[in-house]
C-alpha cells in the first residue's frame, strides 16, 4: 500500500474518537464475527493501541515499521490491528511483517508465508537456526527464554536495518509488562519493566510495544474469533516451571480475588513519585530537592 507523504508533525499524533473505528474495516476483517461483543472488543483494542501510540509518541519521526510476527496470538493480533488502523488512515507508516524461523523442530514453514500473502501485507521470512545454539549453550535444567530472546532480537534488529525500517514493533501486552516488573522486583531487586518505547543500544532503531495497554485475555478472544493460524512454541512453551509462569499465576490470583487490580498496577507504572521511594539517584534526599543528584 502506498502511503501519502506527510510532514513529521503530521505523524506525531492523530486525534481519534470511537467514530473513527466505525465503517468498513480492512479486508482481513471480512472473516470476523458480526456479533456486538466482538465489535466492542475490536474497538476497545483499536482504542488502546491508538492511545499507546499517542501516549508514548510512537509515531514521532516514524515512516517504516518492522512488525515481528511469531505465529502466536499476540503478534497476529498486533499486525491485524495495525493494518486496520493504517487502512483507516490512523497509522501513517509503512508496515513490513517479519517472521524469524529459528529452526525449532516441527515448525510449519508454510503457515506464516501463506497467511501473510493472503492478507496482502509486505513481509519477510528469515531462517536462522538459533534453536541449535540455544540447545548447545544452555545448561540442562535451565530455561531457554533469555538466550532465545536475545538471539531473536539481534536478528530482528539486523533485518530491520536491511529493510530500511526505523522501528521494531513487538506484541508484548499488559500482562507481559506486569510480569516483567514483578520478576525484576522479586529477583532483581529493582523497579523496572518493559518500556512501551525504547531506543536500542546502537541508537538506530526504536522498539515499540503498541499493545502495552491491551489485556492478554482480550487478545486471546480476538485471536480465536479471527481464527488466526496459531503456531505453538515447541521450545520455550514446552518448559515447565518458568519464573514468568509463577508471576502470571500470582497476577491471575490477585485479579481473581480483587478484580481490576491489573489495570491499577499498570497505571501505577505510569505514576512514579521518586520522593516517596528510596533511590537517591532519582531524588536528592540530602537537600530534599526535586532535582536528582549529579
UniProtKB/Swiss-Prot annotation:
Its pathway is:
tRNA modification
Q: What is its EC number?
A: 2.8.1.-
Q: Does the keyword rRNA-binding apply?
A: no
For this chain's record, the cofactor binding note is: Binds 1 [4Fe-4S] cluster per subunit. The cluster is chelated by three Cys residues, the fourth Fe has a free coordination site that may bind a sulfur atom transferred from the persulfide of IscS.
Cross-referenced CDD domains, in alphabetical order? TtcA-like
The keyword Transit peptide appears for this protein = no
Q: Motif range for PP-loop motif?
A: 70-75
One Pfam assignment:
ATP_bind_3
Gene Ontology molecular-function annotations: 4 iron, 4 sulfur cluster binding; ATP binding; magnesium ion binding; sulfurtransferase activity; tRNA binding
Please share what else the UniProt entry notes about this protein: The thiolation reaction likely consists of two steps: a first activation step by ATP to form an adenylated intermediate of the target base of tRNA, and a second nucleophilic substitution step of the sulfur (S) atom supplied by the hydrosulfide attached to the Fe-S cluster.
Sorted alphabetically, which NCBIfam families does this protein's record hold?
Answer: PRK10696.1 (NF007972)
- The name this protein carries in UniProt is tRNA-cytidine(32) 2-sulfurtransferase
Native species: Rhizobium meliloti (strain 1021) (Ensifer meliloti)
Question: What gene name does this entry carry?
Answer: ttcA
Amino acid at each position: 500500500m502506498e502511503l501519502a507523504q506527510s510532514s513529521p508533525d503530521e505523524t506525531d499524533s492523530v486525534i481519534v474518537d470511537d467514530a473513527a473505528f466505525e465503517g468498513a474495516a480492512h479486508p482481513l476483517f471480512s472473516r470476523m464475527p458480526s456479533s456486538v461483543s466482538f465489535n466492542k472488543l475490536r474497538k476497545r483494542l483499536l482504542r488502546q493501541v491508538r492511545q499507546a501510540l499517542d501516549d508514548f509518541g510512537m509515531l514521532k519521526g516514524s515512516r517504516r515499521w518492522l512488525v515481528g510476527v511469531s505465529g502466536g496470538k499476540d503478534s497476529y493480533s498486533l499486525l491485524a490491528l495495525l493494518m486496520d488502523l493504517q487502512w483507516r488512515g490512523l497509522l501513517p507508516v509503512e508496515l513490513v511483517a517479519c517472521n524469524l524461523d529459528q529452526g525449532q523442530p516441527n515448525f510449519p514453514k508454510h503457515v506464516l508465508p501463506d497467511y501473510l500473502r493472503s492478507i496482502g501485507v509486505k513481509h519477510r521470512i528469515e531462517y536462522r537456526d538459533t534453536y541449535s545454539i540455544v540447545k548447545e549453550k544452555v545448561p540442562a535444567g535451565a530455561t531457554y527464554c533469555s538466550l532465545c530472546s536475545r538471539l531473536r532480537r539481534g536478528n530482528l534488529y539486523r533485518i530491520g536495518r536491511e529493510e530500511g525500517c526505523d522501528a521494531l514493533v513487538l506484541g508484548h501486552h499488559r500482562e507481559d509488562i506486569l510480569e516483567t516488573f514483578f520478576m525484576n522486583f522479586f529477583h532483581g531487586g529493582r523497579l523496572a519493566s518493559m518500556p512501551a518505547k525504547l531506543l536500542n543500544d546502537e541508537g538506530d532503531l526504536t522498539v515499540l510495544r503498541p499493545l502495552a495497554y491491551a489485556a492478554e485475555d482480550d487478545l486471546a478472544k480476538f485471536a480465536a474469533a479471527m481464527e488466526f493460524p496459531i503456531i505453538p512454541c515447541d521450545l520455550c512453551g514446552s518448559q515447565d516451571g518458568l519464573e514468568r509462569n509463577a508471576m502470571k499465576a500470582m497476577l491471575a490470583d490477585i485479579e481473581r480475588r480483587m478484580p481490576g487490580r491489573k489495570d491499577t498496577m499498570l497505571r501505577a507504572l505510569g505514576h512514579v513519585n521518586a520522593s516517596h521511594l528510596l533511590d537517591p539517584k532519582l531524588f536528592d534526599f540530602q537537600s530534599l530537592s526535586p532535582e536528582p543528584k549529579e
